[in-house]
Amino acid sequence: MAHATPPSALEQGGPIRVEHDRQRRQFSVRLNGCHDRAVLLYEYVGKRIVDLQHTEVPDAYRGRGIAKHLAKAALDFVVEEDLKAHLTCWYIQKYVKENPLPQYLERLQP
């Protein structure tokens, strides 16, 4: 008999929970139990500079605001750790334009 995966908070209409894996240098949201994930990847490109490189949300979950939660978590991490950020990812560039908070803008690298 197959075991059903318990529904994620997202599927139940609950809050979106972003996890930060510092070792893998990624932020993620579990979408379907432990199988599907939305991710935001970053790399350190200097001692205090991170490159926010790529955001990916599976097609079936797009349009639900998941990428916004990932972008906010990553930018809040930059602020909390007093880092600078280079924005390679087009989505994070768009997020900052739509949310031009001073604490984000002052940490951007060209």
UniProtKB/Swiss-Prot annotation:
Domain N-acetyltransferase: 19-109
Alphabetized PROSITE patterns for the sequence: GNAT_YJDJ
Cross-referenced InterPro entries: Acyl_CoA_acyltransferase, Gcn5-rel_NAT, GNAT_YJDJ
Source taxon at top rank: Eukaryota
Tissue-specificity statement: Expressed in the heart, testis, kidney and lung.
Pfam families hit by this protein: Acetyltransf_CG
Gene3D superfamilies membership: 3.40.630.30
Family recorded in the similarity comment: Belongs to the NATD1 family.
The name this protein goes by in its record: Protein NATD1
UniProt source species: Mus musculus (Mouse)
